[in-house]
């Protein structure tokens, strides 16, 4: 279906109904068909398009915006617009001018958002507390050396905590040790691999528990 002329309200209603069960004009992804319809609408309603795109940038802050009054179009303003239209005066400017103004408003909005975010300061780093099980080879494994080697592992964002020895049978004890990690800095897979590099003492490792702080 073609939507290239929005000079009539019926065309807008038809497009709205057409998109009731669709996200795109044609197919399941954005295509030139969407671009054509968008530009046709923008050409017919450039100021509305600019306003709509600009207000859409405030979506996450709708609830925080101050109260305001929606002005009604006055008769004199409508008459003046009609008169200027009769004189072939371009009320809205070119599409390039609209795009430039919209881009300017967008950049201004991004700058305001960045300033507000900077004023709030950085968010605290997300952290998790992890309980790691480290299993030795047998009952003859030197557990003190095993523990020393584990705690010798250093990573940015890693803090070792308390530990205990848990009997698993046949005289074998596994190391259960707590640690705190910064989620963005420490990969638990990399940490387990580092612990398991101690092949003389470590048979395997498991994440016994994990909880966000």
From Swiss-Prot:
Sequence segments annotated as region (Disordered): 67-88
Subunit record text: EF-1 is composed of 4 subunits: alpha, beta, delta, and gamma.
One Pfam match: EF1_GNE
Family per record: Belongs to the EF-1-beta/EF-1-delta family.
MF term (GO), any: guanyl-nucleotide exchange factor activity
Lineage: Eukaryota, Fungi, Dikarya, Ascomycota, Saccharomycotina
PANTHER family referenced in this protein's UniProt entry, alphabetically: EF-HAND AND COILED-COIL DOMAIN-CONTAINING FAMILY MEMBER, ELONGATION FACTOR 1-BETA
Protein name: Elongation factor 1-beta
Compositionally biased residues, Low complexity: 67-80
A GO term from the CC aspect: eukaryotic translation elongation factor 1 complex
Reported function: EF-1-beta and EF-1-delta stimulate the exchange of GDP bound to EF-1-alpha to GTP.
Domain of life where this protein originates: Eukaryota
Disulfide bond entries: none
Organism: Candida albicans (strain WO-1)
Swiss-Prot/TrEMBL keywords: Elongation factor, Protein biosynthesis
């Amino acid at each position: 279906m073609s939507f290239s002329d929005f000079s009539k309200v019926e065309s807008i209603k038809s497009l709205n109904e057409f998109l009731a069960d669709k996200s795109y004009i044609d197919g399941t992804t954005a295509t030139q068909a969407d671009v054509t319809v968008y530009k046709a609408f923008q050409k017919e309603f450039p100021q509305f398009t600019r306003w709509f795109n600009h207000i859409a940038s405030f979506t996450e802050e709708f609830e925080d915006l101050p109260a305001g009054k929606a002005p009604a179009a006055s008769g004199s303003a409508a008459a003046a617009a009609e008169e200027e239209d009769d004189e072939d005066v371009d009320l809205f400017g070119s599409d390039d001018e609209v795009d430039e103004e919209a881009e300017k408003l967008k950049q201004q909005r991004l700058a305001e958002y960045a300033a507000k975010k900077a004023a709030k300061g950085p968010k605290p780093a997300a952290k998790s507390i992890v309980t790691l099980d480290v299993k030795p080879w047998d009952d003859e494994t030197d557990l003190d050396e095993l523990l020393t080697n584990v705690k010798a592992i250093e990573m940015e964002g890693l803090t070792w905590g308390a530990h205990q020895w848990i009997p698993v049978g046949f005289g074998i004890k596994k190391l259960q040790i707590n640690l705190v990690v910064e989620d963005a800095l420490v990969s638990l897979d990399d940490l387990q691999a580092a612990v398991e590099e101690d092949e003389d003492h470590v048979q395997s490792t498991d994440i016994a528990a994990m909880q966000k702080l």
